[in-house]
């Protein structure tokens, strides 16, 4: 019995050692398996980090490239702006030169216009100088008409009142002659002024003649008082000559 027990103990011991070896082997395999996933995870992490780093580097490179491209674009844009500004500055002097040329041309046209106006002005005074010449005969005719109107007054022996009335009428006619002689040079129609003047004088003579015939009843009219009516006629001739 005792031997059996010892054998059993020995057997147990042997079995225990084998079991222990098996356990150790199993544990080793388990540890190896555990280590291999850890190593794999570490490798994956390292690869991921390297990939991330590479990606970051690529991103940085891309960013740098973009930044450099943006900088170059900005520089090109600035250059284009400077070029456009220079072109605009060049275009402005050209515009100013064109404006100056346009201003010079109207000035030339304006200078030519006064030159054209000068001959016209010269011809106008010539016409005006001819107009007074034509007005002179009319003024002489006007001066002769009052003298003719005074002739019947001498023959009829007018009264003193008639002489005074003629004195007042005679100065009025020289004034009318002066105004008409002044109007005649300004007007371009030469015959119309000369024709209108005699007609107006004829009306004045006609109005003076009835008054003289009506007042001819007084025979005591000295001839000396009728003579002052002739003096204004001569004065009118002098004034017309001065105006000419």
Curated annotation (Swiss-Prot):
Identify the InterPro entries for this entry.
BASP1
Q: Where is the composition biased (Low complexity)?
A: 119-138, 170-219
Q: What is its main location?
A: cytoplasm
GO annotation terms (biological process): negative regulation of DNA-templated transcription; podocyte differentiation; protein homooligomerization; supramolecular fiber organization
Q: Where is the composition biased (Polar residues)?
A: 141-150, 234-244
Lipid anchor positions (N-myristoyl glycine)? 2
According to the record, the residues making up region (Disordered) are 1-244
Question: From what superkingdom does this record's organism come?
Answer: Eukaryota
In which residue ranges is the amino acid composition biased (Basic and acidic residues)? 15-27, 50-118, 154-169
Under Pfam families, the record lists: BASP1
| Record GO cellular component, one term | chromatin
Q: Please list the GO terms describing molecular function.
A: calmodulin binding; protein domain specific binding; transcription cis-regulatory region binding; transcription corepressor activity
Q: Which keywords annotate this record?
A: Cytoplasm, Cytoskeleton, Developmental protein, Lipoprotein, Myristate, Phosphoprotein
The answer, when asked if DNA repair is one of the entry's keywords, is no
Summary of the tissues where the protein is detected: Developing tissues.
Task: Quote the biased-composition stretches of kind Basic residues, using this chain's numbering.
Answer: 1-11
Kindly list the positions at which Phosphoserine occurs in this protein.
6
PANTHER family attached to this UniProt entry: BRAIN ACID SOLUBLE PROTEIN 1 (PTHR23212:SF0)
Q: Which family does it belong to?
A: Belongs to the BASP1 family.
Q: What is this protein called?
A: Brain acid soluble protein 1 homolog
Organism lineage string: Eukaryota, Metazoa, Chordata, Craniata, Vertebrata
């Amino acid at each position: 019995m005792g031997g059996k027990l010892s054998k059993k103990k020995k057997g147990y011991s042997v079995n225990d050692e084998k079991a222990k070896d098996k356990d150790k082997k199993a544990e080793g395999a388990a540890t190896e398996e555990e280590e291999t996933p850890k190593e794999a995870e570490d490798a994956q992490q390292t690869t991921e980090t390297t990939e991330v780093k590479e990606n970051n580097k690529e991103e940085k490179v891309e960013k740098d490239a973009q930044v450099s491209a943006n900088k170059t674009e900005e520089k090109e844009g600035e250059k284009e702006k400077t070029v456009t500004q220079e072109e605009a500055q060049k275009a402005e002097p050209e515009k100013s030169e064109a404006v100056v040329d346009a201003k010079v041309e109207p000035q030339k046209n304006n200078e030519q216009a006064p030159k054209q106006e000068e001959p016209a002005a010269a011809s106008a005074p010539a016409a005006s100088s001819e107009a007074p010449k034509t007005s002179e005969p009319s003024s002489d005719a006007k001066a002769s008409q009052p003298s003719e109107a005074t002739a019947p007054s001498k023959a009829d022996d007018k009264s003193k009142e008639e002489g005074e009335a003629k004195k007042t009428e005679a100065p009025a006619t020289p004034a009318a002659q002066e105004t008409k002689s002044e109007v005649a040079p300004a007007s371009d129609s030469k015959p119309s002024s000369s024709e209108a003047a005699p007609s107006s004088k004829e009306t004045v003579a006609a109005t003076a003649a009835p008054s003289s015939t009506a007042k001819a009843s007084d025979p005591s009219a000295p001839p000396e008082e009728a003579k002052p009516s002739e003096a204004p006629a001569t004065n009118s001739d002098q004034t017309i000559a001065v105006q000419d």
